[in-house]
Amino acid sequence: MEIPVYNASGEIVKNINISEDVFGVPFNEALVHQAFVAQQANARQGTQSTKTRGEVQGSSRKIYRQKGTGNARMGTNRSPVRRHGGVAFGPRPRDFSKDLPKKMRRQAIRCVLSFKLESGELKVIDQLSFDEPKTRDMAKILTALQVISPTLIAVDNPDTNFIKSARNIPAVKTTPANLLNISDMLKNKQLVMTEEAVRQVEELWGQRSG
């Protein structure tokens, strides 16, 4: 399988062969959805908490006698129906994490990479290096490539100049190639990768590596 490689001016400079084991996988919507939900769940802290009627401050004495006042019967002022009372059935700390087998997680990444390539949402550039941080230069490159926002840029070894050149552009996110994940790729319409990043991805998620 061959794909074109662009330079910083948006011109095709060559074609490279890429692995069909990584970029030629049929799309499995159910698998990708499962992997996305698992990643989102694993990112949750699960530390939200409310106080029950047994934990809020206040007396446990019955507010007034059961009968004879004409009012509705009432117990402690810590009851959930009263102001400053405890919360009934509120959120408690819990573990939201979901386990996903390694092979399923890796196959889901291959599915998304293949879908991006097939739908024209993946572009490969020969290199992305900057002598100094220049947002203008990065913006010119993205314009020349005719990318669609939001954009995810993956490189093999991001340096400070590259990160600073891209971080001030709206709807542009950068990531090391070895940290590509389902969530970032699905949330960003366009994926831009350097040639070295493509090779790193093939090595990481090729069939021989698991």
From Swiss-Prot:
Residues 41-51 have a biased composition (Polar residues). PANTHER family: 50S RIBOSOMAL PROTEIN L4, LARGE RIBOSOMAL SUBUNIT PROTEIN UL4M. Part of the 50S ribosomal subunit. One of its GO terms (molecular function) is structural constituent of ribosome. It comes from Dehalococcoides mccartyi (strain ATCC BAA-2100 / JCM 16839 / KCTC 5957 / BAV1). This is Large ribosomal subunit protein uL4. GO terms for cellular component: ribonucleoprotein complex; ribosome. Belongs to the universal ribosomal protein uL4 family. One of the primary rRNA binding proteins, this protein initially binds near the 5'-end of the 23S rRNA. It is important during the early stages of 50S assembly. It makes multiple contacts with different domains of the 23S rRNA in the assembled 50S subunit and ribosome. Residues 41-60, 67-98 are annotated as: Disordered. HAMAP family: Ribosomal_uL4_B. GO terms for biological process: translation. It comes from the Bacteria. InterPro entries: Ribosomal_uL4 (IPR002136), Ribosomal_uL4-like (IPR013005), Ribosomal_uL4_dom_sf (IPR023574).
